[in-house]
Design a protein with these regions (language model features):
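Flexible C-terminal active-site loop/helix
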Residues: 1-18, 26-43, 304, 326-403
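Motif-centric detector for short Cys/His coordination patterns
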Residues: 1-56, 72-78, 89-94, 102, ...
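Conserved, mostly hydrophobic/aromatic
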Residues: 3, 64, 86, 125, ...
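Metal- or metallocofactor-binding catalytic centers and their adjacent structured scaffolds
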Residues: 44, 60-136
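Short beta-strand elements
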Residues: 55-62, 372-373
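Glycine-rich, aromatic-flanked loop segments that form ligand/cofactor-binding clefts
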Residues: 60, 117, 126-162
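Metal-dependent enolase-superfamily TIM-barrel catalytic cores that perform enediolate-based chemistry
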Residues: 151-265
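Shared catalytic-loop signature of beta/alpha-barrel
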Residues: 236, 242, 253-270, 275-377
């Protein structure tokens, strides 16, 4: 079998719905024009990230099998790298040689890669190659990764945005009733908001804790919007709420900062969502910088590299809770002994109620795939096959495709 063609389609971030417009702390919150603490700047992400949300990758073969992968939270340069560089490296080769092809793509892109868009491009191609492998033998990809560890996958509700106290309380209660054991809340404030912001961050954590009680775990996501000093003070205030983890308190390159924060608090610190390859994640592990590792299979190097990252994490006894809950991610989790849960983005009732009749309801990549996974009592079924089992919604892809 040989690869005959590789294509990449840029998908508009509009496909993600309004959730990326809600009030949220981010790595850019230190600059007023990119801040959305009060919800009055809904275009804040598009202002610094541009219009592209996902890049859908399709790898065609002479056996009539087409593999599908994608890179998310993307940039238009990823599609260019795939079509102008990676395609020339893999066309004419056997798609089953995934380890070899990964190494060829990585080495060829070192002059402009090693992290960032180049590794995201490799990730998309690698996921498509895994899809081909599963489709060829008519098995789900998790069977090729070692087989399922369990017959379902625990997941946590990751859509708690503090739009208002009313919606936050209602949404948290909804997730309790839906059977989730863990919920994740977005922080609102960083150093630029001073003590007032700290009090507000604590207030929304306290509100959620009051709603979910002591039985459910709460995680808090700072999305790289804090400084080391601020994070240490903030974690000190939040320790009494027994958080499951505080996510990405500072920028990913500040490994020493992560380690300092982690050593200063009883709250587990998580990171890795914006890290790349085994070498990047190894630095986090060796510095004891995180208690939870969160690689993204669409960013870290695909399934080939994320499996290596998980193996590294196991030698440090650090659990892996990957960023995003896409089908490729679920296949990884299904076959990993040290990946205890998946991220899931529920669509809350208050959001559904305010949508015009017939409007699309989606979060992140759901809109461009048919039949996204749905949990029952906080458990997701094993992802379908053959391959990755994510069929493209061609109508939606055509609607959101960018030239």
């Amino acid at each position: 079998m040989e690869i005959t063609d590789v294509t990449a389609t840029n998908v508009d971030a509009e496909s993600w719905g309004e959730f990326v417009e809600f009030p949220n702390l981010s790595v850019m919150s230190g600059y007023e024009e990119y801040r959305n603490t009060d919800g009055e700047n809904p275009e804040f992400r598009r202002k610094f990230m541009g219009p592209v949300g996902d890049v859908v990758v399709e790898v065609e073969t002479d056996a009539g099998i087409t593999g599908v992968g994608h890179a998310n939270w993307a940039t238009g340069s990823i599609a260019t790298i795939i079509e102008e560089t990676l395609s020339k490296l893999v066309v004419g080769r056997d798609p089953r040689q995934r380890e070899k092809l990964w190494d060829i793509m990585y080495r060829a892109t070192i002059p402009f890669g090693r992290k960032g868009a180049a590794i995201e491009a490799i990730s998309g191609v690698d996921l498509a190659l895994h899809d081909i492998a599963g489709k060829e033998v008519d098995k789900p990809v998790y069977e090729l990764l070692g087989g399922p560890v369990d017959d379902s996958i625990d997941c946590y509700a990751s859509n708690l945005h503090p739009v208002s106290e009313e919606t936050l309380e209602r949404e948290a209660r909804e997730y309790v009733e839906a059977g989730f054991d863990t919920v994740k809340l977005r922080m609102l404030h960083g150093p630029e908001d001073g003590r007032r912001g700290m009090k507000e961050n604590e207030r929304i954590v306290e509100l959620v804790r009051d709603v979910v009680g002591d039985e459910l775990a709460i995680a808090a996501d700072a999305y790289m919007g804090w400084s080391v000093r601020y994070a240490k003070k903030m974690c000190s205030r939040l320790e009494k709420y027994d958080l499951a983890w505080v996510e990405e308190p500072v920028i990913p390159d500040d490994i020493d900062g992560y380690a300092e924060i982690n050593a200063s608090t009883s709250i587990p610190i998580s990171g890795g969502e914006h890290e790349f390859t085994r070498w990047g994640h190894e630095r986090l592990l060796e510095r004891d910088a995180v208690d939870v590792l969160q690689p993204d299979v669409h960013r870290a190097g695909g399934l080939t590299e994320t499996k290596r990252i998980a193996d590294l994490a196991s030698t440090h006894d650090v659990p892996v809770i990957p960023h995003s809950g896409t089908n490729p991610t679920l296949h990884f989790i299904a076959a990993a002994t040290n990946a205890p849960m998946a991220e899931f983005f529920p669509i809350p009732e208050w959001y559904t109620e305010r949508q015009p009749e017939g409007e699309r309801e989606s979060t992140y990549a759901d809109a461009i795939y048919a039949d996204p996974p749905t949990p029952t009592d906080g458990e997701l079924p094993l992802p379908p096959g053959p391959g990755i089992g994510a069929e493209l919604n061609r109508d939606a892809l055509a609607e959101f495709a960018l030239e």
